[in-house]
Amino acid sequence: PYEEIQTHEKILKDVLKKVDKNAELTIAGSYRRKVSDSGDIDVLLKSDDKTVYTRFVKMLSKEEYLIDDLAFGRKKYNGVSKLEGGVGRRIDIMYTTPQEYPFAILYFTGSKDFNLMMRQVANDKGYTLNEYNIEKYSSDKKNRVKNIIDPEGEKIKVEKDIFEFLEMEYREPCDRL
């Protein structure tokens, strides 16, 4: 439930502050879309320091917030978290750099249908869009341009910039059905 995820969010942010005061996290997925019933917890961890991700997951385990590990990869953790007295919840923690973050938050907020629509708009304009970047489509990988520059010459820095680049009206997460 939404209220329970709010409690998870507070715990996660408190632990992250102990690990690195400069790192940030956002709970994405259905929680960010304000859906009343969230089955799992999708956490995006943003930092310039790649070691923050590993230290964060280890600290969550040490504090017995994470009760079961399903997978612990280079950039993504899958496991089970549990509040004191609560039930186990599936949790995914994804590490992202600040440069990848706008694309990651767009993708992991969803919904699946909304992501498919955004990718189709990008394709129709000659681009490929994924959770890492947007590229000018080219069958020759050497000629792909990563993290597209917008018309004013600024890199895409926030989620809204992706909508603007694709000439789309920004949609709040709760409107991404």
Give residue spans per PLM region:
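A short linear-motif detector with a strong N-terminal bias
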Residues: 4-6, 21-25, 58-59
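Active-site nucleotide-donor binding segment shared across nucleotidyl transfer reactions
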Residues: 13-51
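Acidic, metal-coordinating catalytic segment for phosphate/diphosphate chemistry
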Residues: 49-177
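Hydrophobic alpha-helical scaffolding
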Residues: 1-6, 46, 108, 152
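Alpha-helical interaction/regulatory segments in DNA maintenance proteins
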Residues: 1-16, 70-73
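Generic non-transmembrane alpha-helical segments
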Residues: 11-20, 55-63
